[in-house]
Amino acid sequence: MTFLRIATKRAIYLHRPANPALPTSSILPVLHSTNVATRVPSPCAIRHSSHSPLGAAQANPRKKVTMQTLRNLYKKGEPITMLTAHDFPSAHVADAAGMDMILVGDSLAMVALGMQDTSEVTLDDMLVHCRSVARAAQSAFTVSDLPMGSYEVSPEQALQSAIRIVKEGRVQGVKLEGGEEMAPAIKRITTAGIPVVGHIGLTPQRQNALGGFRVQGKSTTDALKLLKDALAVQEAGAFMIVIEAVPPEIASIVTQKLSVPTIGIGAGNGCSGQVLVQIDMTGNFPPGRFLPKFVKQYANVWNEALQGIQQYREEVKSRAYPAEQHTYPIPKEELVEFQKAVDELPEEK
């Protein structure tokens, strides 16, 4: 019984309200949440770790976005919203903001892993990030890029990689770059029942062959090639196609010739929807970073975080933090008894 009294007493002190004016009754719910058998506070009742969870799913999440949901949006002419995410917090906020789709883009090579370009990221890298995103995305339809080197060798290689992305990464579909030449791979994947998003125009994984990050489809010949690629990708079974860095007029015409939605990135608002890299559009990067022309910066997350961290540093240096409200109280008699016990300890020689 002595142990039970001590454990219960400890729970009360750990959960004492920061405002001493609050009645003791405000503490009682904490005791009710303790384990009855031992009276030791349950994990749900105590969270004193410095590694705090980012929170549970929303209380009333949206209905899960499915391929049928996306088809209905397309038929109604309502633009489809897509945003990249590379980890739990970025997916959590994208989902909470109501994104229809979340893309685990291979752009995470640069924005999350500090790599030079997307060609460095591996399938195993993508799987780690996919799982992180999948844990947060309760409603949005999730898709992951197949990274360079994981699908170009053969349709069978593409299928094996796609299966791993869906099975191990826990996302709903895959995206791969390329036009007519990738049709066999797309067909093999979709035949196995895995949704595929195509990607034509500027394909960053092939930027070396394209002469860098250049606008595509600016000549009649190139525009016709773009349309041919789009039709081939659609015929192979892709349920959606990303069009990147293409003049808006060309992207609009291509969109009109297709029976599946297009998602533009640097391709104007004539597409069926839009996608941006979250880090770019939220301004979560240091000053001086190059931004493509098509990016609109909607926030300045870097600056907000910088100011907060600088203030934290200053308050730690000045001992303004932690203040009393950030600490756990101890009964005065316990403190006196502890100090007395310490004073009675023999001095070390």
Swiss-Prot record:
Q: What class of enzyme is it?
A: transferase
An example GO biological process term is: pantothenate biosynthetic process
Q: Name the reaction it catalyses.
A: 3-methyl-2-oxobutanoate + (6R)-5,10-methylene-5,6,7,8-tetrahydrofolate + H2O = 2-dehydropantoate + (6S)-5,6,7,8-tetrahydrofolate
Q: Which domain of life is it from?
A: Eukaryota
* CC terms in the record's Gene Ontology section: mitochondrion
Q: Which gene encodes it?
A: panB
EC number(s) per entry: 2.1.2.11
Any idea what this protein is called? 3-methyl-2-oxobutanoate hydroxymethyltransferase
Cysteine disulfide partners in this protein: none
**Entry's InterPro entries?**
Pantoate_hydroxy_MeTrfase, Pyrv/PenolPyrv_kinase-like_dom, Pyrv_kinase-like_dom_sf
Q: Which UniProt keywords apply?
A: Pantothenate biosynthesis, Transferase
- Molecular function terms from GO: 3-methyl-2-oxobutanoate hydroxymethyltransferase activity; magnesium ion binding
Taking the record's annotation, the residue ranges forming a coiled coil are none
* Annotated HAMAP family: PanB
Q: Which organism is it from?
A: Emericella nidulans (strain FGSC A4 / ATCC 38163 / CBS 112.46 / NRRL 194 / M139)
The record's family statement is: Belongs to the PanB family.
The pathway this protein participates in, as annotated, is: Cofactor biosynthesis; (R)-pantothenate biosynthesis; (R)-pantoate from 3-methyl-2-oxobutanoate: step 1/2
